[in-house]
């Protein structure tokens, strides 16, 4: 396909060797970028209330970034280093310290992740970032920070909408199922759901017009 794909590689799947192997396979699969985070493996979701978010050492994660870059054959795949220092409550200084080390290890982009309900923390972090690597943001918990505001920072080059489509789908499914149960039939929701033809078209298949 023509649209670049960003692959979430979690923590790199274990050791440096695992990370390098995954990076090689993902490059061969024509991924546009892979994102690796500095949490310990296995990990919990960054947004899980009360979740534990221990991080690996800077040296260990820098090794994973270097391994991912060295595994590339074409050099066309972008490696995004995601630091969870803000998620872990370690503060902006630690997030910046880690980002600097990851850039030195070869990261093409830096992702600062925050679960703060306001954009203040992430805005301050980006403002203080002095590295050359551009920044990626994930405005899941701080939706008030829009793209024009990010562009104005001059350092943000990618925005990842990590779960908005999943949450939209969940809400739509719940509403449709509720309507079916209330009306005891599917007629009431027919104009709110995608035609079967459209579903198959998304898969590159064709269906007779009558379906």
Question: Where are the regions that the model predicts?
Answer:
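Alpha/beta enzyme core
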Residues: 1-140, 145-160, 168-174, 178
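Extended, intrinsically disordered, low-complexity segments
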Residues: 70, 165-211
């Amino acid at each position: 396909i023509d649209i670049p794909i960003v692959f979430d590689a979690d923590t790199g799947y274990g050791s440096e060797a695992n990370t390098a192997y995954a990076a090689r396979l993902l490059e061969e699969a024509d991924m546009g970028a892979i994102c690796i985070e500095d949490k310990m493996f296995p990990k919990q979701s960054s947004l899980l209330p009360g979740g534990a978010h221990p991080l690996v050492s800077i040296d260990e994660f820098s090794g994973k970034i270097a391994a991912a870059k060295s595994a590339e054959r074409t050099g066309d795949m972008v490696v995004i280093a995601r630091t969870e220092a803000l998620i872990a409550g370690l503060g902006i200084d630690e997030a910046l310290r880690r980002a600097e080390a990851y850039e030195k290890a070869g990261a093409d982009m830096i992702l600062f992740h925050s679960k703060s309900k306001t954009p203040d923390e992430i805005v301050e972090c980006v403002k203080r970032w002095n590295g050359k690597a551009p920044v990626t943001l994930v405005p899941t918990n701080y939706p008030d920070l829009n793209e024009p505001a990010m562009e104005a920072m001059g350092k943000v080059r990618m925005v990842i909408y990590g779960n908005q489509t999943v949450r939209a789908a969940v809400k739509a499914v719940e509403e449709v199922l509720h309507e079916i149960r209330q009306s005891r039939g599917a007629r009431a929701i027919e104009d709110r759901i995608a035609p079967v033809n459209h579903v198959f078209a998304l898969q590159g298949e064709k269906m007779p017009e009558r379906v």
